[in-house]
């Protein structure tokens, strides 16, 4: 866990990333296509949908693992459905099973969780399995352990305020636990 903290803070060299990720639980399989191919695919989709083309791929700050994929759509146009379906497709195509959704408010967090509940049967018919979503709660560290160790498609839904919370049970996401 300390290595994970140091890596997140940029203290440890990025060469430890893969080794570290394999030692702390399930992780998504690296994509077997190049960054240039991913960027070209992204540009093709953006062009087809009259969206300004990206000039580069975005990654989490300080890491060379994964991509920051942002879905920006007007309210009520199917954003949540789109990213839930994208999770199933990423699982089908690449075996990805870990996703984190960060939302700006508690109300949106609850709405996203509800969307997983109400679309569960629909996606079960299409993909023959379900996603296991949970809402991050600092007083329930076992949920994070389950998320990391479960081989099924798992989604952690967290609101940005959880990163700034204070108190005895707050910020457990950054703490070393038993």
What are these regions (language model features)?
Residues 1-178:
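RecA-like P-loop NTPase motor core of helicase/translocase proteins
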């Amino acid at each position: 866990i300390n290595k994970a903290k140091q890596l997140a803070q940029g203290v440890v060299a990025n060469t430890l990333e893969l080794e570290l990720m394999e030692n702390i639980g399930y992780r998504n399989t690296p994509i077997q296509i190049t960054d240039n191919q991913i960027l070209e695919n992204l540009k093709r989709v953006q062009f087809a949908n009259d969206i300004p083309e990206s000039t580069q791929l975005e990654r989490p700050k300080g890491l060379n693992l994964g991509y920051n994929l942002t879905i920006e759509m007007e309210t009520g146009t199917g954003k949540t459905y789109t990213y839930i379906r994208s999770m199933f497709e990423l699982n089908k195509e690449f075996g990805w099973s870990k996703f984190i959704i960060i939302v700006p408010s508690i109300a949106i967090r609850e709405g996203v969780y509800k969307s997983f509940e109400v679309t569960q049967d629909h996606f079960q018919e299409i993909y023959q399995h379900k996603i296991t979503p949970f809402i991050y709660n600092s007083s329930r560290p076992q949920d994070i352990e389950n998320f990391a160790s479960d081989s099924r498609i798992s989604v952690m839904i967290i609101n940005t305020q959880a990163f700034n919370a204070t108190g005895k049970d707050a910020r457990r996401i950054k703490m070393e636990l038993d």
